[in-house]
Design a protein with these regions (language model features):
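Extended, composition-driven regions rather than compact fold-specific motifs
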Residues: 1-259
């Protein structure tokens, strides 16, 4: 007698912890991409040993004092992190690519009005210095889920790009990519990825909720990634869980908050 068996499910994502290391890095190259991103390539000996196992990892970038140009870094002690009198301004960014042979780290900065990081990135030139810490931890998401859904806005495009590049060899997966745009020119950011068909959506919370509500939920061997503005991400996450999505196969992260 033959017994039918269901296909084995892809394992759940796993978390990896990394030692906390602060590094000073230097701009090697800076270019504008898709009209609204600055692609900065950093280098430096302190990048030796850098590791980023998760496609949506974040590193914390510390910016120089706007008046003095000085970088103020903490000390890492057995008791924890010790900051000096001046704690530098910082922002979180996704490591797009790291080349361990050349110790070069690529980070894409989304350019928007009146942003500390945006202002720095627009003016960045070879030789400029920054400091960074992390990633402190990674969520390692298998690439072989049969069905994968990704939803983000411009803030999540670097992580999405990194993921889509990694998925390119996997021809068997069913991929749904939804991107909410405040700036239409950002469409060009993924234009070179011929294996991906994106659905471009307006930056409207009600329309995003409606689109996700209309989306057919994938079978069990699936992964869903949702990022963007905090309240919108929570609303979509709650909706998906109410519809029966396994929370262990859903990654919902607020990348920014409406003020």
């Amino acid at each position: 007698m033959q017994h039918s068996t269901s296909p084995a499910l892809t394992p759940l994502p796993t978390r990896v912890r990394n030692p906390l290391v602060f590094r000073q890095i230097t701009v090697k190259q800076a270019d504008t991409v898709a009209g609204c991103f600055r692609r900065i390539v950093f280098h430096g000996d302190q990048l030796k040993g850098f590791s980023s196992a998760g496609f949506d990892d974040h590193i914390k970038i510390f910016f120089p004092d706007r008046e003095t140009g000085e970088l103020h870094l903490p000390q890492v002690t057995p008791e924890g992190i010790v900051w000096g009198d001046q704690r530098p301004a910082s922002r979180d960014y996704t490591p797009l690519h790291f080349d361990a042979t050349t110790n070069e780290l690529t980070v894409d900065f989304f350019i928007h009005a009146q942003g500390l990081a945006s202002d720095w990135a627009v003016a960045a030139k070879p030789g400029d210095g920054l400091a960074m810490g992390g990633p402190r931890g990674s969520l390692v998401v298998p690439e072989t889920y049969a069905h994968q859904i990704y939803l983000c806005d411009e803030s999540g495009l670097p992580a999405l790009r990194r993921r889509l590049l990694a998925l390119a060899p996997h021809q068997h997966i069913t991929l749904t990519v939804l991107v909410s745009l405040h700036r239409p020119e950002a469409k060009a950011y993924l234009a070179d990825l011929d294996h991906v068909q994106c659905e471009w959506l307006p930056a409207d919370a009600a329309q995003l909720n409606a689109r996700m509500a209309a989306l057919a939920l994938p079978p069990e061997d699936s992964f869903i990634w949702v990022t963007g503005e905090g309240e919108g991400v929570k609303a979509i996450s709650d909706q998906l869980i109410e519809r029966g999505v396994n929370p262990d196969r859903l990654r919902a992260v607020a990348y920014w908050h409406q003020k």
